[in-house]
Design a protein with these regions (language model features):
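A short acidic, Gly/Pro-enriched loop at the edge of an enzyme's catalytic core
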Residues: 215-222
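Mid-domain Rossmann-like dinucleotide-binding core that forms the NAD(H)/NADP(H) cofactor-binding site
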Residues: 137-208
Length: 318
């Protein structure tokens, strides 16, 4: 039988996936009890219903250190989620306890692979009642990365040709759909097994990077690079004068002097989240969700033996 002390402990602790060893990566994840966070000034605390996860988080300095490079482990990974607000910090406006929300959390704070998370209110957007928590959690990083890469950094215009690497992935599939809606002609790339999925999301051509010649696509106006390396360099050479390569994997060398090379880190933006979720509601934007698992059995989903397909989602609450 549970004691009063056990019940009190349950009120102040939560389950969370924690990392302590950068060398171990996702294999070093541990499920443990952590204190439930409190809402600081301009914060809210959200009861997490579903969390997304990006495997490269294990390579990000922000997972392991704070902004002045001090070790901040044990830390909780995961930075995109959907859930319900349980408390408001001083100064918070426009949100309320019990509200359904989704959003992107600060890279340098404990994340969303937990039952609760504290997050700045400005990083959250209302999650409409007709969008479930699993879908909501799949949108922030992939959707905002695609939106900012195309429209802020890529300056996409109707009639342009866009080359999208990783076309069947969580980000690439969003890029394809938003670029098509923006009036672009879209060429996707990937492996042979990705062809049909890329076409299903809207790619008008597809390049199998293992068997086709990338340069056969001709000149393009915009490259969205999620690969880097040699593919990134070769892609830069395809850009027309005045065109742009946007990268989420670091700077890319090469390209003509009259082309723009932009590498960026996605940022939270409430207005853009609103635009993205409205497109989901309207049927104009489809999510690309892969494995879905619970918090207690998340390790298999976060450490897959095969190639990842789509966004990994951890359901924190049934």
């Amino acid at each position: 039988m549970e004691s009063v002390a056990d019940n009190k402990k349950a009120e102040f602790t939560m389950k969370a996936i924690v990392v302590t060893d950068q060398a171990a990566g996702t294999a070093g994840m541990t499920l443990m009890e952590r204190p439930v966070p409190k809402a600081a000034i301009n914060d809210v605390v959200v009861q997490v219903h579903a969390s997304g996860f990006v495997p490269t988080e294990m390579e990000w300095p922000s997972t392991w250190t704070d902004r002045v490079n001090r070790n901040r482990t044990p830390s909780i990974p995961g930075h995109e989620m959907a859930g319900v607000i349980t408390s408001l910090g001083y100064g918070t406006t426009g949100l309320w306890v019990g509200q359904r929300v989704f959003g992107l959390t600060d890279w340098y704070r404990d994340g969303t692979l937990a039952e609760y998370v504290a997050v700045e209110a400005r990083n959250l957007s209302a999650l409409p009642g007709d969008v479930n928590f699993t879908v909501g959690a799949s949108l922030p990083i992939s959707g905002l990365t695609a939106w900012q890469g195309l429209f802020e950094h890529g300056r996409l215009q109707a009639g342009q040709t866009v080359l999208v690497h990783g076309a069947a992935g969580a980000v690439g599939s969003m890029v394809i759909q938003l670029a098509r809606e923006g009036g672009a002609y879209v060429i996707g790339t990937g492996r042979a097994a990705d062809r049909q999925r890329s076409v299903d999301f809207g790619a008008q051509e597809f390049v199998d990077l293992e068997n086709d010649v990338l340069e056969d696509v001709g000149s393009v106006d915009l490259v969205f690079d999620v690969i880097g390396g040699d593919i990134g360099k070769r892609s830069a050479e395809l850009i027309r004068a005045g065109g742009t390569l946007v990268s989420i994997v670091g700077p890319v060398q090469g390209g003509a002097s009259n082309c723009r090379m932009v590498d960026f880190v996605v940022e939270s933006n409430r207005c853009q989240l609103n635009e993205i979720v409205q497109r989901v509601r309207d049927g104009r934007l489809r999510t690309n969700i892969g494995n879905i698992s619970g918090l207690d059995d998340a390790f298999a989903a976060l450490n897959p033996t095969g190639r990842r397909k789509g966004k990994a989602i951890i359901r924190i609450r049934p």
